[in-house]
Swiss-Prot record:
Lineage of the species this protein comes from: Bacteria, Pseudomonadati, Pseudomonadota, Gammaproteobacteria, Pseudomonadales
Protein name according to UniProt: Nitric oxide reductase subunit C
Keyword Cell membrane: yes
Keyword Acyltransferase: no
Pfam families (UniProt xref): Cytochrom_C (PF00034)
Binding residue positions for heme c: 61, 64-65
Length: 146
C-alpha cells in the first residue's frame, strides 16, 4: 500500500481536509451568529438582575454550583432552579426560606454556608436566577433535576 500512497496524495488530503474543516468552522460560526439573537433574553435584563449577578459573583456561588453547565458540580445546577421550584408564585419565598435555613446541619450531607444576605440581595439573586432560567440554552445542560 505504501507504494501507491504518494507524498502528493498525502499533501492533497492534508490541504483538502484543512479547507473542508475551515469551511465547516465558518458555517458553524455563521449559524451561531444568526441564531444568537433568538436565544438570548438580554432585553429582559433589569437592574435587579445585574445586582443579583453581582451577589452571585461576590459570594462565589459558582465555586459550588453550576449555572448553565459552567462551574463546580459540588452543589446543584441553578440554571433551571426557578422552574424546578415552582416559578413566579413560589420561587422568591422558597429562596428566602432556603437562604435563611442554611446551613441545614444534616449529617453526612454537603453544607451550604450562611452568607447573611439581606432581603434585597436575596430578591436580586432570585431575579438573576429567574433571568438565567429564561435563556434558550438549546436544552443544555441535559440535567433537569439540578
Amino acid at each position: 500500500m505504501s507504494e501507491t500512497f504518494t507524498k502528493g496524495m498525502a499533501r492533497n488530503i492534508y490541504f483538502g481536509g484543512s479547507v473542508f474543516f475551515f469551511l465547516v468552522f465558518l458555517g458553524l460560526t455563521y449559524h451561531t451568529e444568526q441564531t444568537f439573537p433568538e436565544r438570548t433574553n438580554e432585553s429582559e435584563m433589569t437592574e435587579a438582575v445585574v445586582r443579583g449577578k453581582e451577589v452571585w459573583e461576590n459570594n462565589n456561588c459558582i465555586g459550588c454550583h453550576s449555572l448553565l453547565g459552567e462551574g463546580a458540580y459540588f452543589a446543584p445546577e441553578l440554571g433551571n432552579v426557578f422552574v424546578r421550584r415552582g416559578g413566579e408564585e413560589t420561587f422568591k419565598p422558597f429562596l428566602h426560606a432556603w437562604m435563611k435555613a442554611q446551613p441545614l446541619g444534616a449529617p453526612g450531607r454537603r453544607a451550604m454556608p450562611q452568607f447573611n444576605l439581606s432581603e434585597q440581595q436575596v430578591d436580586d439573586m432570585a431575579e438573576f436566577l429567574k433571568w438565567t432560567s429564561k435563556i434558550d440554552t438549546n436544552d443544555w445542560p441535559p440535567n433537569k433535576e439540578g
